[in-house]
Amino acid sequence: MATPGLGVLLAFGLPMLPSGWSLTAPDPFTNSTTQPPGDESNGGLSSGAIVAITVVFSILGVLLIAVGLFLLMRKLREKRQTEGTYRPSSEEQVGARAPPPPNLKLPPEERLI
């Protein structure tokens, strides 16, 4: 099943493809030889474009790793809170060491009717 993002990518990406990538059949009566790439050829990407693409994908990769680490840390903290051992004896010992509060009033005496 295709995701909705794939449709958007195809809708906007296909018109941007170079015309040289079209699926039309070549004309058999024309010369289809190409010149070897040289300094004057404009067919490849410039070094500035390559640097820009590298920088963009590097930033996206770093952001993806940062988001992944953030989600991993959040999941580990959640797991640490929900899983563990319960030791009531240690809580009882801590409560026994605390002195009783001063001026503790007794509850009212219950009487029979």
From Swiss-Prot:
Tissues where this protein is expressed: Expressed in the apical renal tubules (at protein level). Expressed in the retinal pigment epithelium.
Membrane topology summary: Single-pass type I membrane protein
Cytoplasmic-facing ranges: 71-113
Main localization (coarse): membrane
Protein name (Swiss-Prot/TrEMBL): Protein crumbs homolog 3
Short sequence motif PDZ-binding: positions: 110-113
Keyword Membrane listed: yes
GO MF term list: SH3 domain binding
Domain of life of the source: Eukaryota
Spans traversing the lipid bilayer: 50-70
Domain-level remarks: The PDZ-binding motif is involved in the interactions with PARD6A and PALS1.
Signal peptide region: 1-24
Annotated glycosylation sites: 31
Region named Disordered: 23-44, 80-113
Species: Mus musculus (Mouse)
GO CC terms of this entry: apical part of cell; apical plasma membrane; bicellular tight junction; subapical complex
Compositionally skewed regions (Polar residues) per UniProt: 83-92
Gene Ontology biological-process annotations: cell-cell junction organization; establishment of epithelial cell apical/basal polarity; positive regulation of cell junction assembly; protein localization to plasma membrane
General function of this protein: Involved in the establishment of cell polarity in mammalian epithelial cells. Regulates the morphogenesis of tight junctions. Involved in promoting phosphorylation and cytoplasmic retention of transcriptional coactivators YAP1 and WWTR1/TAZ which leads to suppression of TGFB1-dependent transcription of target genes such as CCN2/CTGF, SERPINE1/PAI1, SNAI1/SNAIL1 and SMAD7.
Localization of this protein: Apical cell membrane; Cell junction, Tight junction
High-level lineage: Eukaryota, Metazoa, Chordata, Craniata, Vertebrata
Ranges for region Interaction with EPB41L5: 77-113
